[in-house]
C-alpha cells in the first residue's frame, strides 16, 4: 500500500496509499472486538476493526452500513486515503488538499507545501 523504499518511485494511479516511506513496520493495531490484526478504522464508532468484525458490525443495519471506514496501511498501520463505504467491494480514495504557505516574511521565495487529507464530516 505504501510508496516503498525509493523516494523517486511514484504511487499507483489508484492512489490512497500511505504518504510516508514505510521502512520500519510498526506494532500492529489490534481489532477492538476479537483482538486480531485491525485493517480499518471506523470514525463514527471510533474503533479499529479487522475485516471480519467490520463486516459483522457494519452489516447489522442500514445506519451502520453507511459508516465510512478508513483502511490502514499494511506496513506502518497509519490511516490511508482509501475508504470503505457500505460493502467491502466499494472503495473510495479521498482527495488530498494541498496548502501553500510562506516560511518566513524575509524570504518570500521559500514556500512549504502541506498536504492535508480530506475527511468526511
UniProtKB/Swiss-Prot annotation:
Upper lineage: Eukaryota, Viridiplantae, Streptophyta, Embryophyta, Tracheophyta
GO biological process, one term: regulation of DNA-templated transcription
Placement of sequence motif PFVFL: 117-121
Factors inducing expression: Circadian-regulation. Peak of expression toward the end of the dark period in both long day and short day photoperiods.
One example GO MF annotation: zinc ion binding
UniProt cross-references to InterPro entries, sorted A to Z: CONSTANS-like_Bbox1, Znf_B-box
Expressing tissues: Highly expressed in shoot apical meristems and in vascular tissues of leaves. Also detected in petioles.
Domain of life of the organism encoding this protein: Eukaryota
Organism: Arabidopsis thaliana (Mouse-ear cress)
Keyword Nucleotide-binding: no
GO cellular component, one term: nucleus
Transmembrane segment boundaries: none
Name used for this protein in its record: B-box domain protein 31
UniProt keyword annotation of Metal-binding present: yes
Role: Developmental regulator acting by forming heterodimeric complexes, that sequester CO and CO-like (COL) proteins into non-functional complexes. Involved in the CO-mediated long-day flowering-promotion pathway. Engages CO and the transcriptional repressor TPL in a tripartite complex.
Keywords tagged on the record: Metal-binding, Zinc, Zinc-finger
Zinc fingers classed as B box-type: ranges: 26-72
Amino acid at each position: 500500500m505504501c510508496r516503498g523504499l525509493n523516494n523517486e518511485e511514484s504511487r499507483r494511479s489508484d492512489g490512497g496509499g500511505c504518504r510516508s516511506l514505510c521502512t520500519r513496520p510498526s506494532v500492529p493495531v489490534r481489532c477492538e472486538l476479537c483482538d486480531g490484526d485491525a485493517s480499518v478504522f471506523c470514525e463514527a464508532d471510533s474503533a479499529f476493526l479487522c475485516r471480519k468484525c467490520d463486516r459483522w458490525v457494519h452489516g447489522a443495519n442500514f445506519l451502520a452500513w453507511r459508516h465510512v471506514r478508513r483502511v490502514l496501511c499494511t506496513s506502518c498501520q497509519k490511516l490511508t486515503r482509501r475508504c470503505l463505504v457500505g460493502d467491502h467491494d466499494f472503495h473510495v480514495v479521498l482527495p488530498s488538499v494541498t496548502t501553500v504557505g510562506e516560511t518566513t516574511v524575509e524570504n518570500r521565495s521559500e514556500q512549504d507545501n502541506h498536504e492535508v487529507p480530506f475527511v468526511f464530516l
